[in-house]
Regions:
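Transmembrane helix-loop-helix hairpins at lipid-water interfaces of multipass membrane proteins
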Residues: 2, 20-76, 157-161, 272-276
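Juxtamembrane loop-to-helix connectors within ABC transporter transmembrane domains
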Residues: 4-5, 13, 45, 80, ...
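An intracellular "coupling" helix at the cytosolic face of ABC transporter transmembrane type-1 domains
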Residues: 15, 108-109, 125-134, 138, ...
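Hydrophobic alpha-helical transmembrane segments of ABC transporter permease domains
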Residues: 25, 76, 80, 88, ...
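Helix-loop-helix
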Residues: 52-58, 154-168, 238-311, 316-317
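Short intracellular "coupling" helices and adjacent cytoplasmic loop segments at the cytosolic face
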Residues: 89, 97-121, 125-127, 200-224, ...
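ABC-type nucleotide-binding domain
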Residues: 325, 332-577
Length: 577
């Protein structure tokens, strides 16, 4: 799992191999200069203590070389950091873009069955964690590899016996780090999962503050939050504690190696095999050799978090896409709006059918109303019309063309939709109204707003049509939001209309005005209206009464009342005095 995740992250880095080469080159130059400085230092020491004479001319020249080397190290360390950060940020940008685009490709069922807060956390928090891990990995990896190889060469030049001992003993720290890393991986994965859960809960809590306060749910909400928060603390603490053991453990091993090198080197220096300057140089190299091992284990916690986060991101990218449109998809030209449904069966969960053997023939320009108790399949019927979900069996056609033979985008452009939830995005009122028709003129927008009885309240807004709408339309009433959604649907000038509980949150006077506007826009257009308020659908050409996924009654308002069946009971339950 970990290896496959790392390989996939590396594929995102591949397009930036040019920058990678520059980063590696910077690392090589920086480390080479760093490794040469101890040689200069050793020479300076030997020039000071050799035979009791100080060669000031040589020492001064060496100091100048050291100063130039230090400046070079600083410059090339900066360039290495710059290039690695660019690679990291570009990789994060690409990864986040792919995850966001993936939401356009997955079926609606995926979005419906996953917490929105958790999905948001994967796009924001998890991708950021991957970026942080990449930055640390690059910085430690590039300089670390070059440092290890370079110090090995220099140590073998000075004394191959001590060098061999250092090379054999130091990797013991890697075994310690690997053991701790394996032990903590699952804990870091659980930590990322809990962060997604808590993000989801906070989003739900903040987005529904009116309900929370209306039911005095604050204390219970806090108790629920505290459970998530405490579990995240516990899991996070255990993960961080276990991860934190890696660095001191490896430092202890490497410190013991360094001490052994110092003792053995001192003995060889006394024996005359090494000069004092060479011993000083060797000790510096031994320290630099062990340093990358210490640094890697120091960022092990962050790398583990990054791997766990990348796994969650790739879980989204690996989700099954909507079936692709057929390459020979048919485009319905000059759509008239004839819709035919033949023996449709559908279920959200296998073995739990919701719509069974559903058939309906809708002629162009007909106004179809769908009513029934909650959960009877009304909204599901709309989902099937728009191909948000595909039927299990049966066929839905528009003007004789099976909708599965059409491109989804082309099918959905035929419909104008007003949903039960009035969705508006952060932007001006004008931008929101043009959402379905970006090429509409301002005059066309205003005409649509007037037809939807939204123009009057828009004019009273601080900046009129340029008024900014806050997140989810928080600075508008529910009725105002629905009026804007209705105007948006009108502006798209669709062939067919879908109205899902469109007027359920509008006051009676506004509802009457909206019904008049809808009567105008529905002229000549096939329209499907889903509503619980039966007063809004009296003028429909056909009313379908659904229960348990089946049409149990069908006819006009008067015909259904005359039958004295289920529809009459629904109607009388709403208007009983």
């Amino acid at each position: 799992m970990k290896k496959s995740v790392v390989r996939r992250v590396l594929k995102y880095i591949k397009p930036y191999k040019g920058l990678l080469a520059l980063a590696i080159l910077s690392a090589i130059i920086s480390v080479s200069l760093t490794l040469y400085i101890p040689v200069l230092t050793g020479n300076a020491i030997d020039n000071i203590i050799d035979k009791g004479n100080v060669n000031f001319e040589n020492v001064l020249q060496i100091i100048i070389y050291i100063a130039v080397g230090v400046a070079g190290v600083a410059i090339f360390q900066w360039t290495m950091t710059y290039f690695t950060n660019v690679i990291s940020y570009k990789t994060v940008r690409d990864l986040r873009r792919d995850v966001f685009c993936k939401f356009n490709d997955v079926p609606l069922s995926y979005i419906d069955t996953h917490s929105h807060g958790d999905l948001i956390s994967r796009v924001i928090n998890d991708v950021d964690a991957v970026g942080d891990g990449l930055s640390q990995m690059f910085l430690q990896l590039f300089s670390g590899i070059v440092t290890i190889l370079g110090t090995m060469v220099f140590m073998f030049i000075i004394d191959w016996r001590i060098a061999l001992a250092v090379i054999i003993l130091t990797p013991l720290s890697l075994f310690v780090a690997a053991f701790i890393g394996k032990m903590t991986h699952n804990r870091f994965a659980r930590q990322q999962q809990l962060q997604g859960d808590i993000s989801s809960y906070v989003e739900e809590y903040v987005g529904n503050q009116r309900i929370v306060k209306a039911f005095s749910y604050e204390d219970r909400a806090f108790e629920n939050f505290e459970k998530y928060n405490q579990e995240l603390y516990t899991v996070g603490f255990k993960a961080q504690f276990a991860g934190a053991l890696a660095n001191p453990s490896t430092r202890f091993v490497n410190a013991m190696v360094y001490a052994a090198v110092g003792i053995f080197g001192a003995i060889t220096a006394i024996a005359g095999t090494l000069s004092v300057g060479q011993l000083s140089c060797f000790l510096t190299y031994a320290n630099q050799y062990t340093k990358p091992f210490n640094e890697v284990t120091g960022v092990l916690t962050q790398l583990q978090t990054a791997i766990a986060a990348a796994g969650r991101v790739f879980d989204v990218l690996d989700a099954e896409n909507e079936p692709e449109d057929k390459p020979d998809s048919i485009k319905v030209e000059n759509c008239k709006g004839n819709v035919k449904i033949e023996n449709v069966n559908f279920s959200y969960v296998k073995d739990k059918p919701l719509i069974t053997n559903f058939s309906l023939d809708v002629k162009s320009g007909s106004h179809i109303a769908i009513v029934g108790p909650t959960g009877c399949g009304k909204t599901t019927f709309i989902n099937l019309l728009m191909r948000f979900y595909d039927t299990d069996s049966g066929k839905i056609s528009v003007d004789g063309v099976d909708i599965k033979d059409m491109e989804r985008d082309e099918l959905r452009k035929l419909y104008g939709m007003v949903l039960q939830d009035s969705w508006l995005f952060c932007g001006t009122i004008m931008e929101n109204l043009k959402y379905g028709n970006p090429n509409a003129t301002d005059e066309e927008v205003i005409e649509a707003a007037k037809a939807a009885y939204a123009h009057s309240f828009i004019r009273r807004m601080p900046d009129g049509y340029d008024t900014m709408i806050s997140e989810s339309g928080g600075n508008l009433s529910q009725g105002q939001k629905q009026l804007l959604c209705i105007a948006r649907a009108m502006l798209s000038n669709p062939t067919m209309l879908i109205l899902d509980e469109a007027t359920s949150s509008i006051d009676t006077l506004t509802e009457i005005r909206v019904q008049k506007a809808f009567a105008k826009i529905m002229q000549g257009r096939t329209s499907f209206v889903v509503a619980h308020r039966l007063s809004t659908i009296k003028e429909s050409d056909v009313i379908l009464v659904m229960r348990d996924g089946n049409i149990i009654e069908q006819g006009t308002h008067d015909e259904l009342l005359a039958k004295g069946g289920f529809y009459k009971n629904l109607y009388e339950s709403q208007f009983a005095k």
